[in-house]
């Protein structure tokens, strides 16, 4: 699914129709993500690649106003480098689509994730060892890292991501967010309704029951009282479905919401969205899963692989609306007059559904969980 809807593949089909697109693949940053200390600022190597690529893009285009970074799944690798000293003046705006933006990325966590990666894959977590590993094998290795187990953690659940090394990334994403030290440039941020709820991040695992649900939520870092709160926020779901939704919330939806909340509290220009349109493809029917919004953002519903995951006849008017907002934001750092900024008094959020609309405080039921 990730390959079929990968943004850097879809970007090749955009051409120069609406905006100049520089596509990149963060797989080359795996060595930095696992914290290989054999190279300078290695823990942030993936983020360093983003900064260097954007510096090159700005130089190529000649836009003195700065670049606009867009990341899907790697949205966290957009937000993290956007707030590094090296990126000052490079970015004019950012879009984080389904980004894991406040994952545990302190320097002490990096070696722990690196050691677990090596333990589960039998390969040293170094740049030299991973340099010639195929992309598919890297993804298999990442799945092993994220598999549940007594030696796992919230950080390993996320997998590979930029870590604060004290140099390129001086502070963790959470520290930057709480301190208000982020650069405060315009940010468009959001997620899909279900993300990974339909299929576990870590592949096969035992079905969660009512009896094991509290433990499953605890493994994600939620307090025991969260069980009742999740049932209230997502009525009608089975224990197994709740566990899947909680996983999606913990990794992507909750952190993104926190970023919007904290930025809004500092009156920094922020726009929040939820993509709720659901696939009608047999394998994914009724689910708004991770990556489904990407072909809508690029307005490429007829691109290779889209029908297999979105189903027949995905709504072109929705793609027109999403794409129009993305292009407007990239061009003017504002998605348009029909999408208001996110503020704490109204919490207006764009809902990308069959009929796109703005809804006030759509996450009122989840907020007590997400802001704890």
Predicted regions and their residues:
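Short glycine-enriched nucleophile-adjacent loop
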Residues: 75-87
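Active-site rim elements
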Residues: 100-105, 164, 173-174, 237-250, ...
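Alpha/beta-hydrolase fold catalytic core
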Residues: 222-266, 271-277
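Mobile gating loops/cap/lid regions near enzyme active sites that modulate substrate access
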Residues: 201, 254-372
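C-terminal, loop-rich substrate-recognition/catalytic regions characterized by aromatic stacking residues
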Residues: 182-231, 313-317, 323, 354-372
């Amino acid at each position: 699914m990730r390959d079929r809807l990968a943004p850097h593949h879809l970007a090749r089909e955009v051409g120069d129709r609406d905006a100049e697109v520089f596509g990149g693949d963060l797989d080359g940053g795996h060595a930095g993500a696992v914290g290989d200390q054999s190279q300078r600022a290695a823990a942030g190597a993936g983020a360093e690649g983003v900064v260097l690529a954007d510096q090159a893009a700005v130089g190529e285009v000649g836009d003195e106003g700065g670049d606009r970074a867009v990341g899907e799944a790697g949205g966290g690798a957009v937000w993290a480098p956007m707030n590094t000293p090296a990126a000052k003046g490079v970015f004019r705006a950012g879009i984080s689509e389904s980004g894991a933006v406040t994952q545990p990325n302190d320097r002490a966590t990096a070696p722990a994730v690196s050691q677990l990666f090596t333990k589960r894959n039998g390969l040293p977590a170094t740049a030299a060892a991973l340099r010639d590993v195929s992309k598919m094998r890297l993804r298999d290795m990442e799945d092993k890292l994220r598999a549940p187990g007594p030696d796992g953690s919230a950080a390993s659940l996320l997998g590979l991501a930029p870590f604060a090394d004290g140099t390129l990334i001086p502070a963790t994403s959470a520290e930057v967010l709480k301190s208000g030290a982020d650069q405060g440039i315009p940010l468009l941020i959001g997620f899909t309704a279900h993300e990974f709820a339909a299929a576990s991040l870590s592949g096969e695992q035992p079905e969660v029951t009512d009896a094991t649900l509290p433990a499953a939520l605890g493994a994600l870092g939620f307090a025991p009282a969260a069980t009742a709160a999740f049932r209230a926020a997502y009525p009608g779901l089975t224990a197994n479905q709740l566990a899947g939704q909680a996983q999606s919330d913990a990794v992507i939806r909750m952190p993104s919401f926190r970023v919007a909340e904290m930025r809004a509290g500092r009156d920094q220009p922020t726009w929040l969205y939820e993509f709720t349109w659901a696939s009608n493809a047999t394998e994914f029917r009724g689910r708004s899963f991770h990556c489904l919004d990407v072909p809508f953002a690029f307005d490429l519903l007829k691109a290779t692989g889209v029908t297999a995951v979105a189903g027949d006849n995905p709504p072109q008017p929705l793609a027109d609306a999403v794409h129009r907002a993305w292009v407007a934001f990239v061009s003017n750092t504002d998605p348009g007059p029909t999408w208001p900024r996110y503020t704490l008094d109204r919490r207006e959020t764009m809902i990308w559904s069959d009929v796109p609309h703005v809804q006030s405080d759509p996450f009122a039921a989840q907020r007590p969980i997400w802001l704890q």
